[in-house]
UniProtKB/Swiss-Prot annotation:
UniProt keyword list: Cytoplasm, Methyltransferase, S-adenosyl-L-methionine, Transferase
PANTHER family: PROTEIN-L-ISOASPARTATE O-METHYLTRANSFERASE (PTHR11579), PROTEIN-L-ISOASPARTATE(D-ASPARTATE) O-METHYLTRANSFERASE (PTHR11579:SF0)
Identification of the protein by name: Protein-L-isoaspartate O-methyltransferase
Molecular function via GO: protein-L-isoaspartate (D-aspartate) O-methyltransferase activity
Enzyme class of the recorded protein, top EC level: transferase
Biological source species: Pectobacterium atrosepticum (strain SCRI 1043 / ATCC BAA-672) (Erwinia carotovora subsp. atroseptica)
Gene that specifies this protein: pcm
Length: 208
């Protein structure tokens, strides 16, 4: 039954323009039902966002795939994730690169994500309880930064932690949000707009 649901989801993602086979293989390998509440397990392979508690959500699989594809990852990419959340996006990244650094503002979510990743034998992840606006400077610079909550503007600390040639993908805005791709080239930042999106806000400075 689960296999059929995964096949249906992968077919939907392909129809929506996701082409990276390595990414699709990672999505197939990560059991999304392990990252949602028991009450939502039957919806785990629907292409929809789901609540995970503390006012946060697990992003819809299409958005996870789209944002990950935009990062243009190689196995050697040094990756920073802002907003560990359930750990689902983290797990996808962990299948694609040698190591992932992930920052989560809410301690309970960080602990749960860490436990889930360990249960799935994904040991190439470092998580930290901290303010996503500040990134993780001591582990930088990064080739790729993915932000899974929306700041009203691009955080300066994250721009500083993006390496030359690096790519950052994030939603930006308050009431209306736009998915943006930021590339660092010759010390300058080139910003491209992708599409309108809806994410929870990236809360600044306030740990929970």
């Amino acid at each position: 039954m689960v296999n059929k649901r995964i096949e249906t989801l992968l077919a939907q993602l392909r129809q929506q323009g996701i082409e990276d086979e390595r990414l699709l293989t990672a999505i197939e390998a990560v059991p999304r039902e392990r990252f949602v509440d028991e009450a939502f397990e039957h919806k785990a392979y629907e292409n929809t966002a789901l609540p995970i508690g503390s006012g946060q959500t697990i992003s819809q699989p299409y958005m996870v795939a789209k944002m990950t594809e935009l990062l243009n990852l190689t196995p050697e990419s040094r990756v920073l994730e802002i907003g560990t959340g359930s750990g689902y996006q983290t797990a996808i990244l962990a299948h694609l690169v040698q190591h992932v650094c992930s920052v989560e503002r809410i301690k309970g979510l960080q602990w749960q994500a860490k436990r889930r990743l360990k249960q799935l034998d994904l040991h190439n992840v470092s998580t930290r309880h901290g303010d996503g606006w500040q990134g993780w400077a001591s582990r930088g610079p990064f080739d790729a930064i993915i932000v899974t909550a929306a700041p009203p503007e691009i955080p300066q600390a994250l721009l500083e932690q993006l390496d030359e040639g690096g790519v950052m993908v994030l939603p930006v805005g308050e009431q209306s949000q736009i998915l943006q791709v930021v590339q660092r080239h010759a010390g300058e930042f080139i910003i491209k707009t992708v599409e309108a999106v809806r994410f929870v806000p990236l809360v600044k400075g306030e740990l929970a």
